[in-house]
Amino acid sequence: MTLPDFRLIRLLPLASLVLTACTLPGHEGPGKSPDSPQWRQHQQEVRHLNQYQTRGAFAYISDDQKVYARFFWQQTGQDRYRLLLTNPLGSTELELNAQPGNVQLVDNKGQRYTADDAEEMIGKLTGMPIPLNSLRQWILGLPGDATDYKLDDQYRLSEVNYRQDGKNWKVVYGGYDSKTQPAMPANMELSDGSQRIKLKMDNWIVK
């Protein structure tokens, strides 16, 4: 099916709320070495998670468009996950269901699309070049394929720099939710030039 010129609703009334909620505080204390055993242990604990879910605020900001929404992210197994974006009234703007070899997306008109690559599909449908394949690792506080990254004073990821498809993504973590074990990111910002993606996680459920 030919992909339309689809755009999420610009939820501008949420702008101040989301931008305030996603403001990243400065890091305190010196960073730790990526070779430290504490960091290796933290990575191992996160990678052992089979199922998890989180919800919160999403913002995409560029010179061409601004998108604000609520999001729900759920992983039910290896390479099986669901991403939901909703407006303030709770109506679905986008629902993505992915499993190995098959990705399905439903837009706010109920139109269904299928593809092999979730990242490419979202980019074409929404105009937002979200690095979804890498974000699946970054949202957990893991560097993924990136080798240029820094840790905070608690041996957790604080910054990632990664070049992908001609884009230079910088990921900055503003804090972690220590109520979960292991601690999971509480908010983060991705940037590439004038593009910014902000995520604020309200809570995590991990298994």
From Swiss-Prot:
SUPFAM superfamilies cross-referenced by the UniProt entry: Prokaryotic lipoproteins and lipoprotein localization factors
> Known Gene3D superfamilies for this protein?
Lipoprotein localisation LolA/LolB/LppX
Main localization category: membrane
Q: Is the Disulfide bond keyword given for this protein?
A: no
State the lipidation positions (N-palmitoyl cysteine).
Answer: C22
Membrane topology per the record? Answer: Lipid-anchor
Tell me the CDD domains matching this sequence: LolB
Tell me the domain of life. Bacteria
Naming one, the record's GO cellular component terms include: cell outer membrane
InterPro entries reported for this sequence: LolA/LolB/LppX, OM_lipoprot_LolB
- According to the Swiss-Prot or TrEMBL entry, at which residues is a lipid covalently attached (S-diacylglycerol cysteine)? C22
Q: Mind listing the GO biological process terms from this record?
A: lipoprotein localization to outer membrane; protein transport
Q: Give the residue range of the signal peptide.
A: 1-21
Which locations, inside or outside the cell, does it occupy? Cell outer membrane
Q: What is the purpose of this protein?
A: Plays a critical role in the incorporation of lipoproteins in the outer membrane after they are released by the LolA protein.
Subunit structure, interactors included: Monomer.
The similarity comment for this entry is:
Belongs to the LolB family.
What is this protein's record name?
Outer-membrane lipoprotein LolB
What are the leading ranks of the lineage? Bacteria, Pseudomonadati, Pseudomonadota, Gammaproteobacteria, Enterobacterales
